[in-house]
Structure formats: structure tokens, C-alpha cells
Amino acid sequence: MSDAARPLDPDEAARRLGPWLGAGGQAGGVVLAVSGGPDSTALMGCAAALPPRVPVLVATVDHGLRPESGEEAAGVAALAGRLGLPHRILTWRGEKPRTRLQEAARAARYDLLLGLAREAGAGAILTAHTLDDQAETVLMRLCAGSGPAGLAGIAPARRLGGLLLGRPFLDLPKARLVATCAAAGWPFAVDPGNAAARFARARLRRVMPLLAAEGLTPARLARLAARLRRNEAALAAAAEAARPSLAAAPAGPGRLALDAAGLAALPEAVALRVLADAIAALRAGERRPERLERLEEALFGRILPAIAAGTPLRLTLGGALLDLAGGRLLLAPEPPRRRTKRAG
């Protein structure tokens, strides 16, 4: 049996889950996100076998997108009961969008999980994302034209609404979790949507073996993501360090002002991050950031040349109005557009 398809042994599972679930783990306990697929089923089974542990609550989100989803959620509940773990089914209610369905389902899933974790007083949510998920995410974002932040992929751990979101299996091939379920006799479901050609992730999944044959393996894609996460951390620190020296005269409520010459003197990557962060600060609460291509075109194609030439500039970008004049770049929320009434 190859290492890529070897089941997790109890010691390895304990090393991965111990920091989260062990006696010194998250205060208040942990919520496990378990869909019923092999990855999350392995997470649940391994967690149940780990003594001593903090309180563990298993949660299954029923998105209501497939007729069999309710039955699958009930199957997770039954297995959780046999393993001695409490279980809750969370239902995504309301009308489902016609576009960006997977994106909307993901947002709803995390909202429901976060709500349950807060209700239970849990300190963290664990998901069973794998090396395969990481590789597919990096490839999808590469196809979408993402920059370093997007290509950094899925973080092993991050903050989510004041809690921790952890992914203890992120560097494991999916085949190992499938093998773990098979060895333990834990039943799991297979979502047919994972192979549906209408979804970009499923289409890319089909070509992954061809890419791997050329050397672009899931492990190498995941390694690229790890390297870019390190670079992103350094870039964020550089932008944070530069920000105080860029503060221009007070800009007024709800506005930001940057010293134009100071912005132009920064390394391009740092200047781009400073601009992106400034726009994001004006758009607090909005989930979707401005596309990197537009930021690059605005900064490198218009703003920096105008600073060098000493000419004023006015443009809108990402919901912000940018006004370059008097040696400073003023950023303000873009005013709402007026609708003109048609005559007659």
C-alpha cells in the first residue's frame, strides 16, 4: 500500500487533532463540520477516538440542494451517535440563488456553523479540507487570474467571527481519509455534485491527473500556496509598517489621505497592498475585494504616472473615489449614482 493511500493510525490522528481537541485544546470545545463525505467522516471518527478531549459537537449543514441531502444528514447523525458524539443538523433555508450557487452555499454554511459554535460556547470550528482541496483551490484561482493572496490558497487556520477555523487534514491526500474510513468501517456518502461538469472545480478535478503527469502535482500546488502565504505575511507587515509614514493631513470623516510621494517611493508590491487596504477600509463589511487586475491598472497605469508627472487625477476604483491633488491621494466612498428619468 502506498503512503498516499495509507489509513491514519491512532498516533498520527492524535498528533493532528490533539492541539485542537486535547485536554489543553480550545476552551469551550469544538464544532466539527461533517457533511458525510469521507474526509469529514474520518475527522469525526478520529475525534471520537481521541481521549481525553474537550467537548465536541458534530454539525451537518443540509443545504437542501439535492433530494438525498436530508437522508445523508441523518446518516451522519446516526454514525455520530454510535461514536458517542452529539450532533446537530443545520438547514439552509430560504430561496437559493440562480448564480454563484456554490459560493452562496459556502457562505451560508459558515454562517450556520459560526452561529452554532457561538450558541454552544465553542472556541473553534474544524473542517476536513485536504491536500486535494488545496490543490484544486490554487488551480481555480490561477485560472481566475488571482494574485499572491488568492494563490496562497486555504489557510490551515484563521479567525472566523472571533473564533478559530482549523483544518487539521489540509496536508493529507484525500485517499488517506477514504482509506481511514474503509479500515474503520465508517460509512460515508458521495456527493454527485463533485463530478458535475457545470462546476469549475469538478472540471478542473478531471484534468488534475494530466497535470500531475507533467509534474504539477497536488503536493506541488499546495507547496506553492504555503510559500505564497509566507510572502503574503511579509507583504502585509511591510504595508503596515509603511502606513504611518504615508498618512497625510486629516482627510475628514469617512475618508483617507495618503502622501503621494511616499506612496510612489514604496516598492510596487507594497504600494499595491497599501492601496488595496485603503480601499478595503472604506468598504468595511463588504466581502468581495476589488479585482487585482483593476488595482494594478489603476496604480501602475494611472496613479503612479500622474504622481511622477505632478498632474492631478480623479478616478473611481472599487467603490472608492480617488482624487490626486496637492501632493496627496484622497480616498472617499464613491457617491451613489443618480438614475435619470426618461422623458415621457
Swiss-Prot record:
Belongs to the tRNA(Ile)-lysidine synthase family. It comes from the Bacteria. Ligates lysine onto the cytidine present at position 34 of the AUA codon-specific tRNA(Ile) that contains the anticodon CAU, in an ATP-dependent manner. Cytidine is converted to lysidine, thus changing the amino acid specificity of the tRNA from methionine to isoleucine. The gene is tilS. GO terms for biological process: tRNA modification. It comes from Methylobacterium sp. (strain 4-46). It is found in: Cytoplasm. This is tRNA(Ile)-lysidine synthase. Keywords: ATP-binding, Cytoplasm, Ligase, Nucleotide-binding, tRNA processing. GO terms for cellular component: cytoplasm. The N-terminal region contains the highly conserved SGGXDS motif, predicted to be a P-loop motif involved in ATP binding. One of its GO terms (molecular function) is tRNA(Ile)-lysidine synthase activity. HAMAP family: tRNA_Ile_lys_synt (MF_01161). ATP binds at S35, G36, G37, P38, D39, S40.
